[in-house]
A protein has these predicted regions:
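Conserved "HGTGT" condensation-loop signature of ketosynthase/thiolase-family condensing enzymes
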Residues: 1-136
Length: 136
């Protein structure tokens, strides 16, 4: 089996958007789940969620999203993103920076990047609505 070296990490989570914040929350046993303002309607049985600070992806138009300036994404690229893809993109940028990798090193075929996500509930909901409208 080939050796794998982890040289950089990045986080965008409900317990922090950088290594130090995430580590602090974990060491202090602090969770990232709380009352979500958009869920505080009588019709919804769900009232809590993991809120990611410094990001506002409430608009259906990705070009209206608010996120840290250091992660600026080209307009033609962000138009294809769902919120979880933006979080993954920002985490990858952190990991590349943390590893001190140059562009040519990231482009090297021997370099690999890995990300994980639970997916986008907004996308799941949107597709279920379409299925419902079509009687599927």
């Amino acid at each position: 089996m080939p050796k794998v070296y982890v040289t950089g990490i990045g986080f965008v989570t409900s317990i922090g958007n950088d290594c130090e914040s995430v580590e602090s929350h974990l060491r202090n046993l602090e969770g990232g789940i709380g009352l979500h303002p958009e869920l505080q309607v009588d019709a919804s049985p769900v009232k809590v969620a993991g809120i990611i600070e410094d990001f506002d992806v409430s608009s259906v138009d990705p070009e209206d999203w608010i996120y840290p300036e250091r992660y600026r994404v080209r307009r033609d690229v962000i138009r294809s993103f769902s919120p979880h893809v933006l979080y993954a993109y920002c985490s990858m940028k952190q990991a590349i920076e943390d590893a001190n990798l140059r562009d040519e090193e990231v482009s090297d075929p021997d370099c690999g990047l890995y990300t994980a996500s639970g997916g986008s509930m907004r996308s799941v909901h949107k597709h279920f609505e379409k299925m419902d409208q079509r009687g599927i």
